[in-house]
Amino acid sequence: MEYIVEKIGMSRTITNPSIAVTLLRVVNAKVCEVEGGKALVAYPKGKASNKCVAGQQKKYNLSAEYNRFATLEVANTEAGDLDETPLNEAKILKVSFNTKGRGYSGVMKRHNFAGGPASHGSRFHRRHGSIGNREWPGRVQPGMKMAGHYGNTKVTIKNEVVSYDAENKILVVKGAVPGYNGAMGKIRIAK
């Protein structure tokens, strides 16, 4: 089963020893249509709307707040509210979020290159150095580590479930989760 969640932030338990935990809020979602265990799900995110979204809202009889759509594996067999009962027995989750974007970064930050000497007349400090051979192959090989956009990539990690508050829809998982506070992600029940 899969669910859309919002990252609230990190905290720790008051046990001894304390455990670093991440708080996730399960987003209210409506199942629009189900086919073979997969479902089209609508959920609220911001106030963005256009005629395409308005048409889908009218088709599935949704209120204006449900303005985003996703395909998830669900426990539901028919349209309606998303069934969240499997979260009560969940032990391990696969949590998928986009990492924090760090913009255009050099090779030392992006790929942990050592760089060159700092002093003694060196004019090679934070650059990447040679990127190819000679006449053969006469080109840069695919996959060469270079400067470029760093972060904002999908990362999936496994986390243990510490607790789940079904009334407030707050999920507490052990350890850290990628992304910024307020980021939207996806969880899948692994066990």
From Swiss-Prot:
GO-annotated molecular function: rRNA binding; structural constituent of ribosome
NCBIfam families from the UniProt entry: L3_bact
Pfam families found in the cross-reference section: Ribosomal_L3
InterPro entries: Ribosomal_uL3, Ribosomal_uL3_bac/org-type, Transl_B-barrel_sf
PANTHER family: 50S RIBOSOMAL PROTEIN L3, LARGE RIBOSOMAL SUBUNIT PROTEIN UL3C
Disordered: annotated segments: 115-137
Gene3D superfamilies reported in the protein's UniProt record: Translation factors
Gene Ontology annotations of biological process type: translation
Organism, as annotated: Campylobacter jejuni subsp. jejuni serotype O:2 (strain ATCC 700819 / NCTC 11168)
Family label: Belongs to the universal ribosomal protein uL3 family.
Subunit structure: Part of the 50S ribosomal subunit. Forms a cluster with proteins L14 and L19.
Function: One of the primary rRNA binding proteins, it binds directly near the 3'-end of the 23S rRNA, where it nucleates assembly of the 50S subunit.
Cellular component GO terms, alphabetical: cytosolic large ribosomal subunit
Protein name stated in the entry: Large ribosomal subunit protein uL3
Keyword Manganese among record annotations: no
